Amino acid sequence: MHFLAAAFLLLTLSASALAEPVHFRDCGSGVGVIKEVNVNPCPTQPCQLHKGQSYSVNVTFTSNTQSKGSKAVVHGIVMGVPIPFPIPDPDGCKSGINCPIQKDQTYSYLNKLPVKAEYPSIKLVVEWKLQDDNDQCLFCWQIPVQIES
């Protein structure tokens, strides 16, 4: 089991190394600083997300606080309305971050963004937050996307 987890992590790291950084809008990283956001594959923006596919997300950030844990909260914003966008594992400590999170340390957060087949073909904004134990944002970023068949 540990071998599979290590192989998955290595594959994710390899894929993210090939990814181009995306232009993002910081939406309130109150207790952290985003260094870089990568979504793979996303060669152009807005990112073209295809139904039934999964996209790797890698966020490099520096924490300005300590926290025992972290949780991701993802929304799709359609016409100004945030709609929950479930991800497989919202626990940041299982997404490449060694917890507890230390102040002034830089981390690489790794996760997947699954695009379900039943999602409508639509333009929207993905908002991705990673919150500390006090629900303050270690990072918050937004990017425009287009969901396609």
Swiss-Prot record:
Glycosylation sites: 58
Distribution of this protein across tissues and organs: Found in the fluid from the distal caput to cauda epididymis, not detected in the rete testis and the proximal and middle caput epididymal fluids (at protein level).
Annotated signal sequence range: 1-19
Post-translational modification comment from the UniProt entry: N-glycosylated. Found in the epididymal fluid as a 19 kDa glycoprotein that is processed during its passage through the epididymis into a 16 kDa protein.
Cystine pairs: 27-140, 42-47, 93-99
Record PTM N6-acetyllysine, positions in chain: 116
Superkingdom assignment: Eukaryota
Main location: secreted
UniProt KW keywords: Acetylation, Cholesterol metabolism, Disulfide bond, Endoplasmic reticulum, Glycoprotein, Lipid metabolism, Lipid transport, Lysosome, Secreted, Signal, Steroid metabolism, Sterol metabolism, Transport
Compartments (UniProt record): Secreted; Endoplasmic reticulum; Lysosome
Catalytic reaction(s) noted: cholesterol(in) = cholesterol(out)
Pfam family, one: E1_DerP2_DerF2
GO molecular function: cholesterol binding
InterPro entries: Ig_E-set (IPR014756), ML_dom (IPR003172), ML_Npc2-like (IPR033916), NPC2-like (IPR039670)
GO CC list: endoplasmic reticulum; extracellular space; lysosome
GO annotation (BP), single: cholesterol transport
Family indicated by similarity: Belongs to the NPC2 family.
Record text on subunit structure and interactions: Interacts with NPC1 (via the second lumenal domain) in a cholestrol-dependent manner. Interacts with NUS1/NgBR, the interaction stabilizes NCP2 and regulates cholesterol trafficking. Interacts with DHDDS. Interacts with NEDD4L (via C2 domain). Interacts with NPC1L1.
Summary of the function given for this chain in its UniProt record: Intracellular cholesterol transporter which acts in concert with NPC1 and plays an important role in the egress of cholesterol from the lysosomal compartment. Unesterified cholesterol that has been released from LDLs in the lumen of the late endosomes/lysosomes is transferred by NPC2 to the cholesterol-binding pocket in the N-terminal domain of NPC1. May bind and mobilize cholesterol that is associated with membranes. NPC2 binds cholesterol with a 1:1 stoichiometry. Can bind a variety of sterols, including lathosterol, desmosterol and the plant sterols stigmasterol and beta-sitosterol.
Domains (record comment): Binds cholesterol in a hydrophobic pocket; there are no hydrogen bonds between the sterol and the protein.
Stated name of the protein: NPC intracellular cholesterol transporter 2
